[in-house]
Amino acid sequence: MENVQRLDCPVCGGKGTFVITSHQIDIPYFGPVLETTMICEKCNFRRSDVFPLEVREPKKYILKIESERDLNKRVVRSSSAYIQIPELGVEIKPGPLAEGFVSNVEGVLNRVDNILQTLIRWAETEEQKKKAEELRERIKKLKEGKEEATLILIDPLGHSAIIGEGVEEEILSEEEVEKLKEGIVIMDLDKDKEKEKE
């Protein structure tokens, strides 16, 4: 069932132009998630995220992209997840503007390619443009099955996953979780209660 709300836009102040759409979907081998999209019809501000509706452990997922078949593996990325492709030097960190999505490996590569296209337009030097164009070419080869790389998804909140055969999963240690949470805004009501008791 889809839930739609209209509010005033917190970005531009447009009256009733901020549309929040949320719906629950069930992802095989992951469980139910709430997918939320926020769009302002006036200023075009857009944000989306994915929230699992079941408690999950903080994990790291590792997938070797070795063939075109691997491009179809499902990726659930929440705004708290890190995405890495070490062979390409790609690291996408979570933050206030990070977006969650449900896609596949090819969709992740397309998102990286879109970022590179933007970098090419904004590049200040020819060297920066050349590096971005080389990375785009490597992504193209990955999608054609002519190159191999590793996709790593790390989520200290456990809200993300790579789903499919051949995916390695590692539960994160408490130390890893604390280190990764540094860049993420989290409201922990239990900690606030503990402080009140002191």
UniProtKB/Swiss-Prot annotation:
<dbReference type="InterPro" id="IPR042451">
    <property type="entry name" value="ZPR1_A/B_dom"/>
</dbReference>
<dbReference type="InterPro" id="IPR040141">
    <property type="entry name" value="ZPR1"/>
</dbReference>
<dbReference type="InterPro" id="IPR004470">
    <property type="entry name" value="ZPR1-like_arc"/>
</dbReference>
<dbReference type="Pfam" id="PF03367">
    <property type="entry name" value="Zn_ribbon_ZPR1"/>
</dbReference>
<protein>
    <recommendedName>
        <fullName>Uncharacterized ZPR1-like protein MJ0530</fullName>
    </recommendedName>
</protein>
<keyword id="KW-0479">Metal-binding</keyword>
<keyword id="KW-0862">Zinc</keyword>
<keyword id="KW-0863">Zinc-finger</keyword>
<dbReference type="Pfam" id="PF22794">
    <property type="entry name" value="jr-ZPR1"/>
</dbReference>
<comment type="similarity">
    <text>Belongs to the ZPR1 family.</text>
</comment>
<dbReference type="GO" id="GO:0008270">
    <property type="term" value="F:zinc ion binding"/>
</dbReference>
<dbReference type="InterPro" id="IPR042452">
    <property type="entry name" value="ZPR1_Znf1/2"/>
</dbReference>
<feature type="zinc finger region" description="C4-type">
    <location>
        <begin position="9"/>
        <end position="43"/>
    </location>
</feature>
<dbReference type="InterPro" id="IPR004457">
    <property type="entry name" value="Znf_ZPR1"/>
</dbReference>
<dbReference type="InterPro" id="IPR056180">
    <property type="entry name" value="ZPR1_jr_dom"/>
</dbReference>
